[in-house]
């Protein structure tokens, strides 16, 4: 399964209808974001259907970056039952992402 593309058209539905969602705020020109992408894909393949992991391109949806107070990328925001419960700024490794999931599951 591929990472979900998140945009203004589906962000609300995604975070409100899934119990645990991680949104990666990224941009195609961001080096750290490019490094984080494959790590997120690996995490997603390990955790299965219990967690939705999606990517939101801040260049395409600048208003959402502002709404969610994203000032630096990459930023991972963890939503549980529709509410933000955690966030991580900058590149993080697989173990940190798995810890975010376990802590908030």
UniProtKB/Swiss-Prot annotation:
Start and end residues of each Thioredoxin domain = 2-105
Protein known as: Thioredoxin
Note the SS bond partners: 30-33
Q: InterPro entries attached here? A: Thioredoxin, Thioredoxin-like_sf, Thioredoxin_CS, Thioredoxin_domain
Question: Its gene?
Answer: trxA
| Transmembrane domains' residue ranges | none
Q: What keywords tag this UniProt record? A: Disulfide bond, Electron transport, Redox-active center, Transport
GO biological process assignments: cell redox homeostasis
Entry GO MF terms: protein-disulfide reductase activity
Source organism per UniProt: Treponema pallidum (strain Nichols)
User: What family does the entry list?
Assistant: Belongs to the thioredoxin family.
Q: What is the lineage of its organism?
A: Bacteria, Pseudomonadati, Spirochaetota, Spirochaetia, Spirochaetales
Name the job this protein performs: Participates in various redox reactions through the reversible oxidation of its active center dithiol to a disulfide and catalyzes dithiol-disulfide exchange reactions.
The protein's superkingdom reads Bacteria
Example of a GO cellular component annotation carried by this entry: cytosol
Which PROSITE patterns is this protein grouped with? Answer: THIOREDOXIN_1, THIOREDOXIN_2
């Amino acid at each position: 399964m591929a990472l979900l593309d998140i945009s203004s058209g589906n962000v609300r539905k995604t975070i409100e209808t899934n119990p645990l969602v991680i949104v990666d705020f990224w941009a195609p020109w961001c080096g750290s974001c490019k490094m984080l992408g494959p790590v997120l894909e690996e995490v997603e393949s390990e955790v299965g259907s219990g967690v939705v992991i999606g990517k939101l391109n801040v260049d395409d949806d600048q208003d959402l970056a502002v709404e969610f107070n994203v000032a630096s990328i990459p930023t991972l925001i963890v939503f549980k039952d529709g509410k933000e419960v955690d966030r991580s700024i900058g590149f993080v490794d697989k173990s940190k992402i798995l810890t975010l999931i376990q802590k908030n599951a």
